[in-house]
């Protein structure tokens, strides 16, 4: 810890331990007196960055985690213990009470948010500017952006620059080039995490498909009426809820693409990715409707954890039946890869890890539903 700090800009500028941790901890007997730094403490010197951060989606990561309908069912070591979801979602802003509770459970380390990217105790700006700073969290089943980026031409060129193969001035964007342009810490995207938005599109078929997906997310009830969960999702900024907000983020990304590409190319690539979402939505909506039909016809019994007799995509791996387990993977793994791979310039991910898997999923879901309707016993987890 001390050696890291000695090599940091903080050390050079005279920002010592007491500036961040207070002056009440001065021996091993007073460890409990050390203050846990929060973004507000960083804001004393880095006010602009903290304000930007609070306007972005990273600041809402902890609240988003807590809002998931089956959060309370998970092993606490995974959540508050930071060994699962909490390990990345800890970047989000936490209340004083939440920090106190985390401290009781030994999960107080790394709750400062800023240190998720500027790791302690170097707190290096240069570190946080590298794409590898994003790798720990933006990888894996539902958001493999690192895998997509690092094997795309964007990523390959930058990694070759890091290795000295390409010249220093070679064009090669990082995650930060596109998502944190100019060092802006207010990270947001037009389509959000789950690639839905409001208002509904003019395309009637796509509008119907998106309505079905919103029902699956619990934002609408089975009859199409808005639910309390929609209010929560809006508050957490999970997706854009006005055309103006969506357009603002699209224009920002378009301007980023224009730093290297022509307007026609940049616009065309973004619009092709939009169309990939539309195609993926068609398959996912059909799958949701198939499972919803099983609930409607009482072939599946409503889970005690569900608000309605309707599949809940946000139940994730706690989905109660085998067919819903397949649906959850179709949504969280394969649809994500279809549209994320497209936006991250990785055709292999968009096709073989995404779209191809969705086609297989819908084929299996149709067969599983037919078996259930033909009287074969459905497996409940």
Predicted regions: what they are:
Residues 17-18:
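Intrinsic low-complexity, intrinsically disordered regulatory regions enriched in Ser/Thr/Pro
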């Amino acid at each position: 810890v001390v050696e890291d700090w000695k090599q940091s800009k903080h050390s050079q500028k005279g920002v010592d331990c007491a500036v961040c941790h207070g002056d009440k901890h001065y021996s091993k007997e007073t460890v409990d007196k050390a203050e846990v730094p929060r973004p507000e403490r960083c804001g004393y010197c880095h006010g602009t960055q903290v304000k930007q951060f609070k306007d972005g989606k990273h600041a809402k990561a902890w609240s988003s985690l807590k809002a998931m309908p089956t959060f309370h069912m998970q092993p606490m070591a995974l959540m508050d213990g930071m060994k699962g979801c909490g390990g990345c979602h800890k970047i989000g802003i936490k209340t004083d009470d939440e920090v106190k509770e985390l401290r009781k459970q030994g999960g107080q380390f790394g709750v400062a948010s800023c240190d998720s990217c500027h790791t302690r105790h170097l707190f290096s700006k240069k570190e946080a500017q590298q794409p590898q700073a994003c790798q720990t969290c933006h990888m894996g089943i539902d958001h493999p952006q690192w895998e997509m980026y690092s094997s795309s031409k964007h990523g390959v060129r930058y990694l070759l620059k890091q290795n000295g193969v390409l010249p220093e001035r070679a064009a090669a964007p990082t995650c930060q080039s596109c998502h944190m342009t100019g060092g802006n810490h207010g990270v947001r995207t037009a389509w959000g995490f789950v690639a839905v938005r409001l208002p509904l599109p003019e395309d009637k078929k796509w509008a119907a498909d998106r309505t079905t997906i919103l029902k699956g997310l619990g934002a609408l009830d089975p009859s199409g009426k808005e639910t309390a969960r929609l209010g929560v999702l809006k508050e957490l900024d999970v997706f854009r809820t006005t055309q103006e907000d969506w357009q603002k983020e699209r224009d920002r990304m378009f301007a980023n693409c224009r730093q290297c590409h022509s307007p026609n190319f940049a616009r065309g690539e973004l619009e092709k990715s939009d169309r990939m979402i539309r195609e993926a939505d068609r398959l996912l909506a059909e799958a949701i409707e198939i499972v919803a039909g099983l609930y409607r016809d009482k072939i599946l019994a409503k889970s005690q954890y569900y608000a309605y007799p309707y599949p809940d995509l946000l139940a994730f791996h706690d989905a109660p039946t085998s067919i819903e387990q397949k649906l959850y993977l179709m949504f969280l793994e394969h649809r994500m890869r279809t549209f994320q791979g497209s936006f991250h310039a990785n055709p292999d991910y968009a096709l073989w890890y995404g779209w191809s898997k969705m086609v297989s999923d819908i084929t299996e879901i149709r067969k599983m539903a037919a078996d259930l309707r033909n009287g074969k016993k459905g497996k409940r987890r």
